[in-house]
Amino acid sequence: GDGRVVEGHDPVTGAVRWSYSRDTDLCGVSWVYRFAVAVFSDDRGCGQASTLDGSTGQRGPARSSYSDRRVELSSDGTTVLSAGDTRLELWRSDMVRMLSYGEIDARVKPSSKGLHTGCRLASAAASSSAVSVLEACGRQADLRLTLLRPAKEEDEPDQHNVAEPGIGADSGAKILAVSETRTAVYLPAPQPRVDVIDETGTTVGSTLLPEPPLTTNVVTRSSNLITWWTGHRVMVFDTANLTYRYAIGPAGSSAPVGPATLLAGKLMVPVTDGIAVCDPVNGVGEDFLPVHRAPGDVPVIPLATGAQLLEQRGKTLVALGPG
């Protein structure tokens, strides 16, 4: 999607199968099950969401609500998280809101936060049953981690706050992934690391990093694996419990240039001059596929659809194949 238009392409030929446009700007595109989820702006922010069948472009469920002027969309395949600087929402595939948190323009309940009264949401991620967010609140110097779970009322989620002493609002700390009961979070101090925190706020695992990640770092979810490209290497975690498995780093003049995806039972890792084909169990390289890419500084994000391997390079989607 770009501008005011969302297009569906044939994954093999690249031909446009369908397009959908609105008379307002597109804020972002995500996905859930077989649907693309397109979010457009209106006078209440980026809150106009439409689902579109990925094969035909036929419209499905839609929703509208208050939102920030800029949002980041993410999905675990069954739910969609829309997160801005002051508000987030978790949507089911039918676009019913499961959970909302943060500021709202029209307060209905005393517990609701009016505009300019809440915290800045520095980073957020979700699973189908939980949301975790790093917040910068008031004059507090440190971020806090807030663990959210859907409750009887979608705008009154269960909350558990975890202090993160020494982690400033602009430190680069980031929620990497959320499972049913755990959260993986990158924390830069006192030493760069990934902590895994359970629903009680207890740290149940910690992995040190040899260097801080780049600001362009990217997380992807593929089947039973979560991969995080730090800008230097790809770190791999289990989806279910977020246990750290292994890392794939530079080898000679070749280094990872993006996160990984699974295709035909193999872990496909974009590297400087091609694709490293690795064993998903231990990360050991098994094969190499040369790929010519124009020089660039954007992450290369691989995607698998059926037997087709795609790469997202900035705003360009490239289908890889023989030839």
Predicted regions and their residues:
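Short beta-strand elements that form the blades of beta-propeller/WD-repeat-like
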Residues: 1-2, 30-44, 50, 76-90, ...
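Acidic, serine/threonine- and glycine-rich low-complexity intrinsically disordered segments
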Residues: 102-239
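Repeated scaffold domains used in trafficking and secretory/extracellular systems
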Residues: 22-35, 64-78, 108-124, 163-180, ...
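Long, acidic/polar, low-complexity amphipathic helices and coiled-coil-like
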Residues: 8, 13-143
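Aromatic (tryptophan-biased) beta-strands that constitute blades/sheets of beta-rich domains
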Residues: 1-26, 50-66, 95-108, 155-166, ...
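Intrinsically disordered, low-complexity segments enriched in Gly and acidic/Ser/Thr residues
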Residues: 208-217, 221-292
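Hydrophobic/aromatic beta-strand positions that recur at structurally equivalent sites within the blades
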Residues: 9-10, 50-53, 90-93, 146-150, ...
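N-terminal export/targeting signals for secretion/compartment entry
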Residues: 283, 291-294, 306, 311-323
